[in-house]
Amino acid sequence: MKIEKTCKCIKDFTVDEYVFHKGREYQVDVYPLYYQIYQNGGWDDYIFISSDEEFNEYFKLIE
């Protein structure tokens, strides 16, 4: 599923959804207790997200 928004309630994600932000693609993997985001399949930008606030803050930081 392709998502064109960056600020989205993270509980709405399912495994292998994608976020597009300023021309970059981020995959969002959802697990019961945490969320993972990484850019273009690369581990360099791989992060763990545990709340909606952290998710939205991450995309604010990379603007």
Show where each model-derived region lies.
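Acidic, low-complexity, intrinsically disordered interaction modules
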Residues: 14-58
